[in-house]
C-alpha cells in the first residue's frame, strides 16, 4: 500500500473522532464558496448565492454527508482505492463530466476542515498522512480519465 502502518494508524485514530455528517457538509460547502466555478455541477441544489446560503443549504449538507461516507468507506479499503471508487469514478467522470482537478480541490478543503476541527491534534505527520490519502482518493476518482 502507499501508506505506512504508522500513517494508517494516524489516519484511522483521527478519523474515529470525525463527525462524518457535519464535516462532509462543511467540506463540500467550503469547496463551493472557495472555488465558485465548482457550483456549476450543483445547479439543482437551490440557493448558492452567498457563503451563508451555501453553508446552510440542506442539499449541500446532504451531498457532503454522502461524499464523506464514501471517503470513509475508502479508508476501510485503503489499499484498493481504485476498486473502491471505480463506480463513483464512472459516474462523476463519464456521466457528470466533472473535471478530476475538482477532486483534488475537495481533498485539500477536507484537510483544511480537519485542521480547523482538530487544531493541535492535527499535527504535521497527521496532515502528511491525510494529504497522501486525499491525493490517492482523487487519483482513484480520476481513474476513468486515464
Curated annotation (Swiss-Prot):
Q: Which Pfam families match?
A: Globin (PF00042)
Residues that coordinate or bind heme b:
63, 92
Question: From what superkingdom does this record's organism come?
Answer: Eukaryota
Q: Which InterPro entries has this protein been placed in? A: Globin (IPR000971), Globin-like_sf (IPR009050), Globin/Proto (IPR012292), Hemoglobin_b (IPR002337), Hemoglobin_oxygen_transport (IPR050056)
Domain Globin, by residue range, is 2-146
Question: Which keywords, in A-to-Z order, does the entry hold?
Answer: Acetylation, Heme, Iron, Metal-binding, Oxygen transport, Phosphoprotein, S-nitrosylation, Transport
PTM-bearing positions, type Phosphoserine:
44
Biological process, per Gene Ontology: hydrogen peroxide catabolic process
Expression across tissues is:
Red blood cells.
Please give the residue positions where the record annotates the modification N6-acetyllysine: 59, 82, 144
**Positions where S-nitrosocysteine occurs in the chain:** 93
Record GO cellular component, one term: hemoglobin complex
Q: Which PANTHER family match?
A: HEMOGLOBIN FAMILY MEMBER (PTHR11442), HEMOGLOBIN SUBUNIT BETA (PTHR11442:SF42)
Per UniProt, subunit arrangement is: Heterotetramer of two alpha chains and two beta chains.
Q: Which family does it belong to?
A: Belongs to the globin family.
Biological function: Involved in oxygen transport from the lung to the various peripheral tissues.
Q: What is this protein called?
A: Hemoglobin subunit beta
The encoding gene: HBB
Amino acid at each position: 500500500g502507499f501508506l505506512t502502518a504508522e500513517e494508517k494508524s494516524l489516519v484511522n485514530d483521527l478519523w474515529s473522532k470525525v463527525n462524518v455528517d457535519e464535516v462532509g457538509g462543511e467540506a463540500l460547502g467550503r469547496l463551493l464558496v472557495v472555488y465558485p466555478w465548482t457550483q456549476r455541477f450543483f445547479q439543482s441544489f437551490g440557493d448558492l448565492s452567498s457563503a451563508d446560503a451555501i453553508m446552510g443549504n440542506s442539499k449541500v449538507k446532504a451531498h457532503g454527508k454522502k461524499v464523506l461516507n464514501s471517503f470513509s468507506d475508502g479508508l476501510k479499503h485503503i489499499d484498493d482505492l481504485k476498486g473502491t471508487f471505480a463506480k463513483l469514478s464512472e459516474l462523476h467522470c463519464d456521466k457528470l463530466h466533472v473535471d478530476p482537478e475538482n477532486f483534488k480541490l475537495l481533498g485539500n478543503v477536507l484537510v483544511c476542515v480537519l485542521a480547523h476541527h482538530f487544531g493541535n491534534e492535527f499535527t504535521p505527520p497527521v496532515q502528511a498522512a491525510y494529504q497522501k490519502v486525499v491525493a490517492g482518493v482523487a487519483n482513484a476518482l480520476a481513474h476513468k480519465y486515464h
